[in-house]
Amino acid sequence: MFSNQYIQQRIHKANSLREEGKNPYKNGLKRSLTNAAFLEKYAYVKGLEEPKDKEKCESVVGRVKLLRLMGKACFIKIEDESAILQAYVSQNELNDEFKSLKKHLEVGDIVLVKGFPFATKTGELSIHALEFHILSKTIVPLPEKFHGLSDIELRYRQRYLDLIVNPGVKDVFKKRSLIVSSVRKFFEMEGFLEVETPMMHPIPGGANARPFITYHNALEIERYLRIAPELYLKRLIVGGFEAVFEINRNFRNEGMDHSHNPEFTMIEFYWAYHTYEDLIELSKRLFDYLLKTLNLDSKIIYNDMEVDFNQTSVISYLDALETIGGISKGILEKEDRLLAYLLEQGIKVEPNLTHGKLLAEAFDHFVEHKLINPTFVTEYPIEISPLARRNDSNPNIADRFELFIAGKEIANGFSELNDPLDQLERFKNQVAEKEKGDEEAQYMDEDYVWALAHEMPPTAGQGIGIDRLVMLLTGAKSIKDVILFPAMRPVKNDFNVEGEE
């Protein structure tokens, strides 16, 4: 692993420090200010004419990002999480320690500098070192400074390196943290209670997806990593909670692309005595709050598309297929004609798909990617909505919506099915679909039906994909860009180091 010549040179320098009686992995020294706080506190120091006050001594830390040696002095750029700060180190101040520094210090090392503020000839606020300590000696060179880390695959596999050399990446994940905390704060302000439900389920449910399977040794039974928390959250509504939410991971054993990762973060929330129309209004308020919190305009650019949050619309599923997808009602209303149409368009579909699933295929191919401004699509076919409430005036459609922005599904919500007999029949239909080969059809969950039999009040529930939400609000083009450690195919890592900084 460490046979590379550049690594061996650094290991030799670490050992050389030990021979001088210095621990290359020192502990216990503390900074007095972050780099950003130093720059703010001493911003009044403008030039060399400013008196140098050695009594104003501070300690700062960071990773060496740039090193310029000039005989008996050197300039060092050090970076902590807050900012980059320049340090000036001279032999006049450090004496023999300066010789050790010149011998051992390299880009990538973690250091502590203790000194006073001053400004260079160019007016750059810096710290004039009185003490200098190597806290952690790097033994692997960073990627070449002018080109950074551009290999996409390597960036995802070695995210720690990506964060070191690409400053914008860290900004994305700071913004992700702000988005998640803002979503949490919004729901708390709306009166929702945050809860936690199981991550391992005896029966996978809450969504149509293929689960990951694990084994519980103590119980000697299989368990499933959850594909959604929905059925547990609705059990809480049965139990008397009226507004709950959970922000956590879901797992779906399916394909990966630029908008899908098998392990992803969602918020799901359930609201007793409300309907899906109330959720639409709540979603609008949520986005208004997020745009304000993130200081974003109502118009944002995503993937070269202008998304205008002031142009939010609501349209029914069939109307979207007709007016946006360009498919006539005569075709949409007849299962055989719709199947023939899809095949004519070159779309591969199974001949035994139900009418509702054929409509879903048509929607995915002809409508979804065209929904740029926030669009709430309502009145979904009941066949593809096994947990949603039937519409009172048309039992073939569900009181359900999905929110699409920039051509992607962002949220799914509906008035919840709370009729236990209807739910039991829907589960039976799902089991029949599974027996026909539909691996994503839902399992029978009699325990959940029994919970519903104790009656759940009229309730509306919704899920929002946090990762896609972060993509939208940060402009990220791939879901891997907003997940710190995305799923990757295993490879044998040769830990190759191609060159020195």
Swiss-Prot record:
- Cofactor details (free text): Binds 3 Mg(2+) ions per subunit.
GO molecular function annotation: ATP binding; lysine-tRNA ligase activity; magnesium ion binding; tRNA binding
Q: Which key words are in the record?
A: Aminoacyl-tRNA synthetase, ATP-binding, Cytoplasm, Ligase, Magnesium, Metal-binding, Nucleotide-binding, Protein biosynthesis
Enzyme Commission code: 6.1.1.6
Q: Which residues bind Mg(2+) 1?
A: E402, E409
Chief location of this protein within or outside the cell: cytoplasm
Catalysis: reaction(s): tRNA(Lys) + L-lysine + ATP = L-lysyl-tRNA(Lys) + AMP + diphosphate
A GO cellular component annotation here is: cytosol
Where is Mg(2+) 2 bound in this sequence?
A: E409
Cofactor dependence: Mg(2+)
Sorted alphabetically, the Gene Ontology BP terms of this entry are: lysyl-tRNA aminoacylation
In terms of Gene3D superfamilies, this protein maps to: Bira Bifunctional Protein, Domain 2, Nucleic acid-binding proteins
Report the subcellular localization.
Cytoplasm
Q: Assembly and interactions?
A: Homodimer.
Q: Per its UniProt record, what HAMAP family does this chain match?
A: Lys_tRNA_synth_class2 (MF_00252)
Its family remark reads: Belongs to the class-II aminoacyl-tRNA synthetase family.
Q: What protein does this entry describe? A: Lysine--tRNA ligase
The gene designation is lysS
